[in-house]
Structures are given as structure tokens and as C-alpha cells.
């Protein structure tokens, strides 16, 4: 059995390379899985780049709505008479409610596809945006923030979709850019919602407690529009939608229980769950607290605090993509080991800068400087993380993406509960403690080891192939005979580039497109 896999590996390389030129229905270079080999952010080419734009816009909308309360919190807490524990609990609810939703979303993507997953979660969370206009108590505020926060599960569909549409040579960049531009909503909402609030205040003749409620209609409408657009315009895979491919026999009908087991049994996934909890989880936490921190610590007005706070999220314009680019570049030079080193270095630097931001509590200018540098490392760590995630498992990619994405929310829940809910801990102290925690948790990158590629400190085993890891480990011999592993075989061939350069197959000149 093992020798048969080795034979497939040596015979499949040239076939996979020639397949790049075989399918003429695409106007851009694709690999043997019909995945795009490059990302052009200015292209709307269907289906690859159209999916890219729909995925990031759907995720962007969920971020805008989830953190819409943060820049208006000074008005909301006065209207609803909220205490610091009330605000902390609501912030927790906004990011905690989606933990289960993200785990579930992974299986949804594996079984029915990312298009349905992204669309349905946007439409289900839209009513909570509208209901925020009718909230009159702390309990109602908490429930609505939790319901709106479910929209953050769109992240899993976003990353799954990109991993299905883009080749390993640019998957880090595609994942990072789509997620980064989506996360940008957390920065945009910091200045967008105060502006909408100001406009509504004028429209309601100065009734400030009505103005913030009317402002919430905008996120609700955005959810509805994007949910419908993704449902009727998007496409799951380069070759078509899940339903068609299942019916035609071109795509395996996956068992949700089997894919759950494959994901849960992979220890690499759990290491990434923890580390992602302290990059994306930190971003969620900062989106919840930074505007109020600047407002209270430096006695700023609402719009100024929101505008400065938006600098944190606005780094997503380039910083998460930067992490993906560095990960892809290091992979070309050093293989998977380069990706792992990138994540550890950038995320450790994130923790150090977080501590420096806390120590700068007496200077607004220094606080903003370290906040921006800290933010860049946070987003870059997220981009570097999802340069690794697509390689943890192939058959259970959705499950792995779901759990790791949920780890981000779990990390935010832990940070909010430990450092920013108790009235006895000053916010700047909470930020400092969070920085030290980031540095410690990031050490979990060290034990991540791929048998064929190695880890940070140890090389891979040349006697172990990609087929051994992705096929022999995840499929039974009967399933292989039935042809269920054929699509994964193509993925294995396209993953040879994650080896150390000296171990990669030599491409013929005609195959280099």
C-alpha cells in the first residue's frame, strides 16, 4: 500500500504540472485542481476573484455590526445605565456566542459548501441588528450583541472558500487578504458608526438616545444585502457548486462525523487553536475596549476616541496580507518550516508591543504609536497562521478552519474575562497582562511537526510523503479504491513546494506557467 502511494507521488508530478495548461475554461493560470495560481485584487474574474471579493465583503459586514456598539458605548451606557461589569459581559457575549457557530460552520463548509455557510449566517444574524433599536435593558443589550456576534462565523467560510479557490503558491496571501479586509470592518466601524450616529442625531433633532438606535439599521441592511448576494451570485468551487458536483460524482459526499474526528484527532489543529486565540482573539478584544480606553484614559470626545481607535483595525488594509506574503515567501525559501518560524517571530513581537502599549499609559502619542505597531503584528500573525492552516488536514479542512477560527473567539473570551471585566483591574494593566500571555502561548508553535516537512527545530523525514500524511492517514484502503482520494492526490502534488528546497521535484521548463 505504501509503495503504491510512493509510485503515485513520483508519477503524478508531471501530470499535475501539465494539467495547469489543460483546462481552457479559465482565463487565468490554474493548477491541477483548477485553483488560481495568483491573486489579483483588482480582478473580478469568475469564479476565483469574484469569490475573493464576496468572501471578504461578507466578513467585513459581520465585523462592522459586531463592534458597532464599541464607538458609541459612552452614549449607550448612559441610556441603558450600564455598569463596567455589564459592558464587560456584553463584550464577552459578542465574541463568545460565535465559538460554537464557528465550529459548526466548519462542518457546514465541508458538507454543503462555503456559499451557503456564509450567506445563511449573515441572514440569521441580521434580525439581531434590527432588534438592537428596541433594547431597553442590560440583558437585552447582551442578547443582541451575542446574536450579532454569531456573524463572525463568516470567517470560517471566508477562509475555507479561499483555500478552495487559490493554489498553495498564493493561498497564504489570499487567505490573509480576504480575512484582513474583512477584519477591516472592526476599524471602519470605529469611525463609521459615530458619523452615522451624528447624522441620526441631526435627523432626530438632538435626541441622542434615539440616534444610536436608528444607527443600527445600517448594519442590519448590510447583512441582508450581502447574504442575498452571496447566495445567488457566489460559486463554491472552481468547477461549480457543491450540489452539482455531488450529483455528477465529481465531489466526495463527506460525513460530518468522520471529518469531525479527523480534525479533533490532529494535535496540530489544537496548537493552532491556542495560538490563533492570542492573535485574532486579541484583535477582537482590542476592538471591544480600545475606544473606551482612549475615551476614559485621555479624556477624549466620542468622535476623536473612535477615530483614533479605528487606527487599530485599519491596519488590516495591509498588515494581515503582509503576514500572508511573508509566510508564502518563507515557504518558497525554506518550506513549511519557514511558515512556522514566521508565525512564532511575528506573534512573539506582537506580545512585546502589547506590553509596551500598556506601559505608555501616560502619553497619548506614545500609546497610539505602540498601538499601531502592536496592531500590525496582530494582523500579520493572523495572516501567517492561515498560511499554515490549509496544510493541517485536507479531508477535514473545514473542521480545522472552524475550530481554529473558534479559537480566536475563545481567546478573546479568556482575555475579556481575565483582564477587562473586573473593576479591580485597570484597563492598562489588563493590556500588559494580555501581552505577557501572548508571548507564553505562542510557544505552542514549537511542537507543530509535519512528518514529511518537519518543524521549527527539526527537519522532515524524507521517507514520508505527502500521500502518506493526507491519504494513507485520512482514507481507508477501500475509500482509495473507490477513487475518493483522487482530489486529495492532486492537492498532495501541489503541496510538494512545502518541502525543503533540496527535496522538491524538478519542474520541466514547459510546466512553469
Regions found by a protein language model. Name each.
Residues 67, 94-103, 153, 187, ...:
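Residue-level signature of mid-helix packing/kink "hotspots" within the transmembrane helices
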Residues 144-182:
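Cytoplasmic helix-loop-helix junction between adjacent transmembrane helices
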Residues 9-64, 78:
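Cytosolic juxtamembrane N-terminal segment immediately preceding the first transmembrane helix
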Residues 116-130, 337-355:
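Structural signature of the two symmetry-related core transmembrane helices
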Residues 100-139:
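Conserved MFS/SLC helix-loop-helix module at the cytosolic interface between two early adjacent transmembrane helices
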Residues 69-73, 265-323, 382:
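Extracytoplasmic gate region of multi-pass secondary transporters
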Residues 178-238:
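Helix-loop-helix hairpin linking two adjacent transmembrane segments in secondary transporters
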Residues 172-198, 316, 404-415:
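Glycine-rich segments within core transmembrane alpha-helices of 12-TM secondary carriers
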